[in-house]
Amino acid sequence: MTVFMSDIRMAAQGGPGFGNDVFDRLLSERIIFLGSQVDDEIANKLCAQILLLSAEDPTRDISLYINSPGGSVTAGMAIYDTMKYSPCDIATYGMGLAASMGQFLLSGGTKGKRFALPHARIMMHQPSAGVGGTAADIAIQAEQFAATKREMAQLIAEHTGQTFEQISKDSDRDRWFTAQEAKDYGLVDHVITLAEGPISN
């Protein structure tokens, strides 16, 4: 079976090709937009878009704009791993709110190409998860949750230049940052004004 780029583009957007749809137009400029809670459906769309743009031109940057309260850890990690798998540099832009998994993806962009708009707010905290079932099931889930917490703290430490211990301490409760504070902390590299901000590659 032959799969064409237009088919992937259609699947990524959940509808037919470019037309007048604003998100299709953005995709044609190599701009991806995460503007909702992170779940499996959103993750599948974003992963497909990253893979599509990587296949179309592996030498050009992809811009990921983030205005998200966070969401599923596993869905977010699927996006993160696809970002790292792509041969393209992924420039990330925090706008509005980049919280929880939104913060994680923002700081996971290509070093030197992580931006925050001036009035963006960034929030970092430890991952959360509900547990249930038998006592044995709860113990297994708690062990997995602790491992995920350590893994994410280590990755954030690598992306920010902070120590693992500092990230673990700061993310124990909700930690809020202004755009400038996020830059000072290492979550982003630049704070840009609306006039300065690059819109496309």
UniProtKB/Swiss-Prot annotation:
- Output one GO BP term: protein quality control for misfolded or incompletely synthesized proteins
Per the Swiss-Prot or TrEMBL record, the active site comprises 100 (nucleophile), 125
Q: Can the keyword Cytoplasm be found in this entry's annotation?
A: yes
Q: What is its EC number?
A: 3.4.21.92
Enumerate the Pfam families for this protein. Answer: CLP_protease (PF00574)
> SUPFAM superfamilies per the record?
ClpP/crotonase
What NCBIfam families does this protein's entry cite? PRK00277.1 (NF001368), PRK12553.1 (NF009205)
Q: Belongs to which family? A: Belongs to the peptidase S14 family.
**Name the record gives this protein:** ATP-dependent Clp protease proteolytic subunit 2
- Source species: Corynebacterium glutamicum (strain ATCC 13032 / DSM 20300 / JCM 1318 / BCRC 11384 / CCUG 27702 / LMG 3730 / NBRC 12168 / NCIMB 10025 / NRRL B-2784 / 534)
Taxonomic placement: Bacteria, Bacillati, Actinomycetota, Actinomycetes, Mycobacteriales
